[in-house]
Curated annotation (Swiss-Prot):
One MF term in the entry's GO annotations: host cell surface receptor binding
Protein's name in the database: Hemagglutinin-neuraminidase
Gene Ontology CC entries for this record: host cell plasma membrane; membrane; viral envelope; virion membrane
UniProt-listed SUPFAM superfamilies: Sialidases (SSF50939)
Gene source species: Newcastle disease virus (strain D26/76)
C-alpha cells in the first residue's frame, strides 16, 4: 500500500517538474519574442529617421547627376578618340599628300631645268618658303555650316610692292595678269610711255617670283627674275601662267585699233613666250592662219592661264568670220542668265531675240564675238601642239576677257561681264584630250561690275552691249564635297562708272562686310585676285592686283592689295541693284586714301565718270 502511494507521489512530482520547465520555456520564448519585437521596432524607427520621404524623392536627381558626369567623361574620351582619328586618318594623309604634291612639282620643275642646263640654258630652282606648302592652289576654307559671308577681308596690309609703277606723269601701266603655282608666281602688265590712250607702241613687263615669310612673320612677294620687253613688237592683252618651265605668256601683236581689227579679214597675230628660270625670254609666233582660220580678231583673255595635264590653258576671245564653219556652228545659239529675285519683265520672245543679238554687237560691225580656250603643250619647244576649244553659246555669253583657274582638283573659267549680265560668272571646266568643256556657271549676284545703260550694274534683261570691266572672283569657300560656296574679289561698286573699288567675300546672293580702297569717287579699273594660306599659322590671305587712279605719276598705278580673311558671326549685306547702303550692326573698314584727294570733288567726279566709262 505504501509502495503504491509512493509510486503515485513520485509520478505527481515528475508531472509538476515537467509543468514547471514548460512554463519556464514558454516565459523565455515570450521574453525573446518581446525583445525581438523591441529591437525590430527600434531598428524601424531608426530607419525611418534616416530615410525620409524627401530623401527618397531626391534619389533620381542624384542618379541623373551621376549619369551626366559619367556621360561627360565618356564624351570627353570620345572627342579625344575622334581627334586622334581625324589626325591619323584624315589630316596626316592630306598633309603628306600636299607635301608630296609640292615636292613632285618641285622635282618636275627641277627636271625641266636640268634638261635646260644640259642645253646650256643655266638656271636656278625657285620655290616658295616651306610655310606655304599645301597652301597654294588648294581649297582654302572647307566649311559646310558657316555662312559664307561670315568670312570677310581685313584692312589692307602693308607689304613689299613687287609691281613697278610709272615714273612720270605721262606714264601708264595697265592690264595686269597673275598666276601662281605650288612653286612660283608669274606676273605681267603693259607699259605705255605716252598715256593710256596711246595704242601705237608699248612695253611688256614680265616677272617671276616666290612667296616669302619675313623674320617677323609677314608675307611678301619676292621677284627673282624680270624682264621689260621693249622692242618693236606691240604686245597687248597678254595672259600669263606659271608652268614647270617658268612663266608662259600668250599675247596678241597689235598694229591697229580693236574696231579696225574686227573689220579686217585676217586673224590677229599671236605669240607664245616664256621667261625661264634663268631670266632669259624666248617667244614664238603661232600659226594663226591655221589655228584661227575662222577668226578675224583674236586676243588672249588678259586673266591668268593654268597648267593642267602637261599643257597650259589660256582664255581667248575675238570675232568670227561671218558664215565660217565656226560661225555657222553657233548660229541661233544663246543663253539667258537671270538675276537673283529680280526677273526681267520683257516678253520671253523679245528676251530671246535680244539675247541672240547680244553676240553680234554693232561696235564690231555685227561680227559674232566668241569665247574660246587655247591649250598648248608645255615643253622646251614653244607653241607646240596648240589646240583651240570653242564652247557653245548655249553655255557662254558673248566672248570677253577671262581667266582659267585651278583650285584643288577643280578647274574654273571666269568670263568678264562685257555683255548684259552684270554678276560675276565662274564656269566649272573639265579637260579631256587637249580640249576643255565649260558647264553651267556659278553666279554671284552681289559681285557686279559697272556698265553703260542698258547694261549697268543693276541690269536684268538681255541686251546688246560691249561694256563692263575685268574683275575676277577667286574660289575661296567650299563644301566638303568640293562644291564651290563662295569667292573673294575686288569689285567696282558703282552703277555705270569705274569707281569705288571694294573687296569682299561673296556667296551666290550677297556679300560680306567690305574693305574700301578709298573714297567712293576713287577711279579704278581691272582687278585680279588670288588667295593662299600660310600653313604654319593657318592664316588665309588674298591678293587683289588692282588698277587704281594715280594723278601724280601716271594715269593708273597697279597696286597689289593684300588682306587677311577673317571670320565673324555671319553678318551679311543684302543687295538688290547697287550695294552701297550700309546695314545696321557693322561698319566698313575704311582705309585712308592712298592717293591724292581732289579739291573739287563735284567736277572731279564728273570728269572721272566720263573718263572711266571710256575705257575698253
Amino acid at each position: 500500500m505504501d509502495r503504491a502511494v509512493s509510486q503515485v507521489a513520485l509520478e505527481n512530482d515528475e508531472r509538476e517538474a515537467k509543468n514547471t520547465w514548460r512554463l519556464v520555456f514558454r516565459i523565455a520564448i515570450l521574453l525573446l519574442t518581446v525583445v525581438t519585437l523591441a529591437i525590430s521596432a527600434a531598428a524601424l524607427a531608426y530607419s525611418m529617421e534616416a530615410s525620409t520621404p524627401s530623401d527618397l524623392v531626391g534619389i533620381p536627381t542624384a542618379i541623373s547627376r551621376t549619369e551626366e558626369k559619367i556621360t561627360s567623361a565618356l564624351g570627353s574620351n570620345q572627342d579625344v578618340v575622334d581627334r586622334i582619328y581625324k589626325q591619323v586618318a584624315l589630316e596626316s594623309p592630306l598633309a603628306l599628300l600636299n607635301t608630296e604634291s609640292t615636292i613632285m612639282n618641285a622635282i618636275t620643275s627641277l627636271s625641266y631645268q636640268i634638261n635646260g642646263a644640259a642645253n646650256s640654258s643655266g638656271c636656278g630652282a625657285p620655290i616658295h618658303d616651306p610655310d606655304y606648302i599645301g597652301g597654294i592652289g588648294k581649297e582654302l576654307i572647307v566649311d559646310d555650316a558657316s555662312d559664307v559671308t561670315s568670312f570677310y577681308p581685313s584692312a589692307f596690309q602693308e607689304h613689299l610692292n613687287f609691281i613697278p609703277a610709272p615714273t612720270t606723269g605721262s606714264g601708264c601701266t595697265r592690264i595686269p595678269s597673275f598666276d601662281m603655282s605650288a612653286t612660283h608666281y608669274c606676273y605681267t602688265h603693259n607699259v605705255i610711255l605716252s598715256g593710256c590712250r596711246d595704242r601705237s607702241h608699248s612695253h611688256q613687263y614680265l616677272a617671276l617670283g616666290v612667296l616669302r615669310t619675313s623674320a617677323t612673320g609677314r608675307v611678301f612677294f619676292s621677284t627673282l627674275r624680270s624682264i621689260n620687253l621693249d622692242d618693236t613688237q606691240n604686245r597687248k592683252s597678254c595672259s600669263v601662267s606659271a608652268t614647270p618651265l617658268g612663266c608662259d605668256m600668250l599675247c596678241s601683236k597689235v598694229t591697229e585699233t580693236e574696231e579696225e581689227d574686227y573689220n579686217s579679214a585676217i586673224p590677229t597675230s599671236m605669240v607664245h613666250g616664256r621667261l625661264g628660270f634663268d631670266g632669259q625670254y624666248h617667244e614664238k609666233d603661232l600659226d594663226v592662219t591655221t589655228l584661227f582660220e575662222d577668226w578675224v580678231a583674236n586676243y588672249p583673255g588678259v586673266g591668268g592661264g593654268s597648267f593642267i595635264d602637261n599643257r597650259v590653258w589660256f582664255p581667248v576671245y575675238g570675232g568670227l568670220k561671218p558664215n565660217s564653219p565656226s560661225d555657222t556652228a553657233q548660229e541661233g545659239k544663246y543663253v539667258i542668265y537671270k538675276r537673283y529675285n529680280d526677273t526681267c519683265p520683257d516678253e520671253q520672245d523679245y528676251q530671246i531675240r535680244m539675247a541672240k543679238s547680244s553676240y553680234k554687237p554693232g561696235r564690231f560691225g555685227g561680227k559674232r564675238v566668241q569665247q574660246a580656250i587655247l591649250s598648248i603643250k608645255v615643253s622646251t619647244s614653244l607653241g607646240e601642239d596648240p589646240v583651240l576649244t570653242v564652247p557653245p553659246n548655249t553655255v557662254t555669253l558673248m566672248g570677253a576677257e577671262g581667266r582659267v583657274l585651278t583650285v584643288g582638283t577643280s578647274h574654273f573659267f571666269y568670263q568678264r561681264g562685257s555683255s548684259y549680265f552684270s554678276p560675276a560668272l565662274l564656269y566649272p571646266m573639265t579637260v579631256s584630250n587637249k580640249t576643255a568643256t565649260l558647264h553651267s556657271p556659278y553666279t554671284f549676284n552681289a559681285f557686279t561690275r559697272p556698265g553703260s545703260v542698258p547694261c549697268q550694274a543693276s541690269a536684268r534683261c538681255p541686251n546688246s552691249c560691249v561694256t563692263g570691266v575685268y574683275t575676277d572672283p577667286y574660289p575661296l569657300v567650299f563644301y566638303r564635297n568640293h562644291t564651290l560656296r563662295g569667292v573673294f574679289g575686288t569689285m567696282l561698286d558703282d552703277e555705270q562708272a569705274r569707281l569705288n573699288p571694294v573687296s569682299a567675300v561673296f556667296d551666290s546672293i550677297s556679300r560680306s562686310r567690305i574693305t574700301r580702297v578709298s573714297s567712293s569717287s576713287t577711279k579704278a579699273a581691272y582687278t585680279t585676285s588670288t588667295c593662299f594660306k600660310v600653313v604654319k599659322t593657318n592664316k588665309t590671305y588674298c591678293l587683289s592686283i588692282a588698277e587704281i587712279s594715280n594723278t601724280l605719276f601716271g594715269e593708273f598705278r597697279i597696286v597689289p592689295l593684300l588682306v587677311e580673311i577673317l571670320k565673324d558671326d555671319g553678318v551679311r549685306e543684302a543687295r538688290s541693284g547697287r550695294l552701297s547702303q550700309l546695314q545696321e550692326g557693322w561698319k566698313d573698314d575704311i582705309v585712308s586714301p592712298i592717293f591724292c584727294d581732289a579739291k573739287n570733288q563735284t567736277e572731279y567726279r564728273r570728269e572721272l565718270e566720263s573718263y572711266a566709262a571710256s575705257w575698253p
